Amino acid sequence: DAKGVYELLMGEASVEEVTCSTEIETLKIIPSRVDLTGAEIELVNRESREKVMKQALTGIDEYEFVIIDCPPSLGLLTLNALAVSNSVLIPMQCEYYALQGLSHLLKTLKLVKKSINPDLKVEGILLTMFDGRTLLATQVKDQVQKYFSDFLLKSIIPRNVRLSEAPSHGKPIMLYAGRSRGADSYVELAKEIISRSKSDVRPKTSLTGSAA
């Protein structure tokens, strides 16, 4: 089997050994498998366990953006991602419990910034699975705008059938349905993130997670 994130964190493979090319020439990935769930347990007794990923990714400087996709929980793996990242992109479903979890997540990020990674900042809050036809989605959007306007991105990812179908075909939305409304929304997001990062000359290491 091909090696991935688990082997990288366990010190069994280098970044070069686990990096894979994709159909998109400028996009490379480091895959993960179900065995990554075991890494959390194995890292518990490791010295400086919250910085294992940072050490593993040392020397990566040929990429403009490094995006770490995190699970919707604040466990040790997510903490490792926070320790190595310059900024955090927070995707938030337009649902009630996600709104509740957002305040808790932002408080946690402040603690991480204070104790582990002083360079960490919030890149923005991204509203996802938005359906303007529902009252709840509109209410959640209004609440985020009211209380977290400094962080709220202009880009919004709508609820879209093509976006839902793409993973089952093993393709990113740009290859599966590049002219769909869902694809257009991600293009706008990419433009917004690039525009916001132009003043930062460092290689950009961001992570995504979930507010709830």
Q: Which stretches of residues belong to each language-model region?
A:
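P-loop NTP-binding core
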Residues: 1-212
